[in-house]
Structures are given as C-alpha cells and as structure tokens.
Amino acid sequence: MSVTIALDAMGGDHGPQVVVPAALKVLAEMINVKLILIGDRDLLNGLVAIHRGELGTRLTIQHASQKVEMDEAPSQALRAKKDSSMRIAINLVKSRKADACVSAGNTGALMAIARFVLKTLPGIDRPAIVSALPTIRGHCYMLDLGANVDSSAQNLYQFALMGSVLASAIDNIKEPSVGLLNIGSEIIKGNERIKEAGRMLSQSHLNYVGFVEGNDVYEGCVDVVVCDGFVGNVALKSSEGVARMVRHYLRESFQRNYLTRFAGFLALPVLKAFHQRMDPRRYNGANLLGLNGVVIKSHGGADITAFAHAIRIAVIEARKDVPQHISAHLEPWLSEGQVV
C-alpha cells in the first residue's frame, strides 16, 4: 500500500539539516512511500538537488513562507502562522493529499493547530500524546505524555479506550491489557479522579487489570499504561534521565584503567546490544491520538536516526489507518462509559 507523508522540514532544533537526510534514509529503505518536504523551497532544493535523479517523484517539495518557532505561543502560531510548514503539513492531511504528517516542532503549537484543523474523533474530548516505551517483555504504550496536564476521569477513560485500540491495531494483540498509573495498586490509593476512572474501566469490556505503579511500567506488566499528561511527561523525562545516567556510569566504569578497558573491549558486543535496546532514538515518534488524521510528534532535538524512526511510525500508522480503526471500535465502548 502506497502512503504519502508530509514532513514539517523547518520544525525542531535542527530543521532541514536533520529532516532532509532522514527523509532520504527512509526513502532508501522503504518502497511505496512518498514524502512531501514542506519549508523554504530554495533551501530544500539545495539540500536534495544531488538526489533528484534517484528519487524521481517519491520526494516533492512544497513551499512555506513561515515557520513556527520552538518558543512560540500556541495561540500565536494558530492565528498568525497560517503559511507555516507545520500548518501546511497538517492541512495536507486534512485535504487527504497526505496520509500522515511528522513534525519535530513546538508541541503546544502542533497540538493546537492539529486539533483546530483536523478536529477530534466523535466521542473524544481531548487528544492524547502516546508513544511506545521499552520494557523487559518488549514494549508498552503510554498515554498521555504531555498534551493534557489536568485530565478528568472521563478523559482517562477515553485515553484507555484509544490506547487499547492502538495496541490492538499496531501489535495485533487481541485483548491488550490496560493499567492506570497510580501511587499504589490498592483500590483505596490515588486521588478521586484516578479512583473514578478505575471504576469506569472496571465496568468496561476492556482488559483492565487495575492500578499499576511506576516500577511496573518497564517490567511490561501491561500493554497500555494510562495517566494524565503531567504525570506521564514527568515519568517519561525521568526515565530518559535514568537511561542516560546508566550509560554514563557504564562508560565511566569501563574507562578507569587498562584492565577495565580490556573488559570493556570483551564486553563490546553485549554493550552494543544494550545500547541499541535502550536507545531512545528507536522509540522516537509520538502519536497525537484522537484526531481525524495521523499526526506524529518527533522529539525537538532528534537527530537523523531518530527523525527517520518517527517517519517510519507515521508510515505504519497511516497504513493501519489508526484513526478509522479507533472510530470503528469506540462507539460501543464510549457508550459503556456514557461519555458520548
């Protein structure tokens, strides 16, 4: 199945210097994929000129006269940046000229513009940011990772529904297990919102296993972890910091003297496998779940490898038509929670 992905080439900390090589990398790896680079036409033409012959019509450029700055207020980006590379990328999804879009730009602006242009799916109040996280047993999906810092029980219920459908669609899991992130597994733990969301989910047809704690996330106890955006973002950033610390200590330990360096040389294959498994670039690319279209948010500081992975995520979710898949499964479940 051929898919077309629109790329915000001007977004992120590195802009076209990362987006263009990442696009070329993906096109070299994946067939039946077309990419649209959106940004400064002259700049982008210069970066892709030497590859024109081999790419043919698989890579096209669409000019954008504006870009959304990383520190720009979402309201300003929405009102004043109608010809920005971010806005045009989302517009292409809306007009079905692209099957998905990817941006490393300002998260708040991306969410505001995407929600304004694409709208949310019927029965969904707020989109959520969801991403795969590595676990001992493979990976799990965690949402929300920062789109909503104050979520109601109803929002959490909807996040659980969407996360379950996503895991089922992408990983072909018949009944994905779902857990609510909490300060304890006992039903008496947590604030009233968490308790109410737990009651709603326990009465649903989802494979809801109850509350899970932070240490359960990376043990792979559940397929889908649900939380509000404040908690999810703190948990995500904390885990990224721990991963960097572990890599630092390993590197430091193997460089203490000649003996440890030799031990490090012998352990190199194991260390490479460890680094690859824990490499955050392999998990770059978060879905703005709950919209009428596929929008993938890349980390703002992503390098070529990381941004290429975000494009691959967009291709997979576009081919699966995740929004349509969610819509088809949501109505009976939403009726259970009386949230339509």
UniProtKB/Swiss-Prot annotation:
Gene Ontology MF, one: phosphate:acyl-[acyl carrier protein] acyltransferase activity
Protein family membership: Belongs to the PlsX family.
Subcellular localization, as worded in the UniProt entry: Cytoplasm
Pfam families per the UniProt record, alphabetical: FA_synthesis (PF02504)
Gene (name only): plsX
Origin organism lineage: Bacteria, Pseudomonadati, Pseudomonadota, Gammaproteobacteria, Chromatiales
EC number per UniProt: 2.3.1.274
One GO CC term, this protein: cytoplasm
The protein's name: Phosphate acyltransferase
Protein's organism: Nitrosococcus oceani (strain ATCC 19707 / BCRC 17464 / JCM 30415 / NCIMB 11848 / C-107)
Keywords: Cytoplasm, Lipid biosynthesis, Lipid metabolism, Phospholipid biosynthesis, Phospholipid metabolism, Transferase
